[in-house]
Amino acid sequence: MIRTTLLLAAAAVLIPAAHAQTPLDPCTLLTPDQIKAVLNSPVEPGQPGVAKGSDECTWGDANGDDRVYIALRPAADFHTFRKQIEKNGGQVTPVTGLGDDAFFVSPDESSSALYVLTKTHLLLLTVTPPDSTQQQVQAAEKALATQILPKL
């Protein structure tokens, strides 16, 4: 009886651990070469956020200017972010063909942020190429997102 109880307890501990999702390192989702191919501008290797196990990564150029930023959040945050952005007067533009749902937020005429919902994650992606229009920024964000999404 004790042996059976111990076996069941061990199974209860081990089974959820086997199904637990391994946290993704966002800095492994893109390479400097992938970014350079989209931006026509070289970048340094990605740098994780300051917190240990950060869900953020930033790629900058040799001058220290940030060029690409990604953050991974739980998928459940997607609708909360969207509602908060809309509540604060942000312009949300739906995007088709990416993930389960996606939208751009454009705070001004030359910048943008892309939010993409997958089954398990919210991907936030911003791209700041040198001397680019908002349309070029959004095209770059979509291009990089299509390279990231198969890894999520």
Regions found by a protein language model. Name each.
Residues 1, 34, 77-81, 136:
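Exposed alpha-helical structural elements
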Residues 1-6, 23:
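Short, basic/polar N-terminal leader/transit segment immediately after the initiator methionine
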Residues 4-18:
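Sec-dependent N-terminal signal peptides
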Residues 19-54, 58, 91, 136-152:
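N-terminal "mature-domain start" segment
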Residues 21-23, 93-152:
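A short, solvent-exposed beta-edge/loop patch
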Residues 37-109:
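Short, solvent-exposed recognition patches
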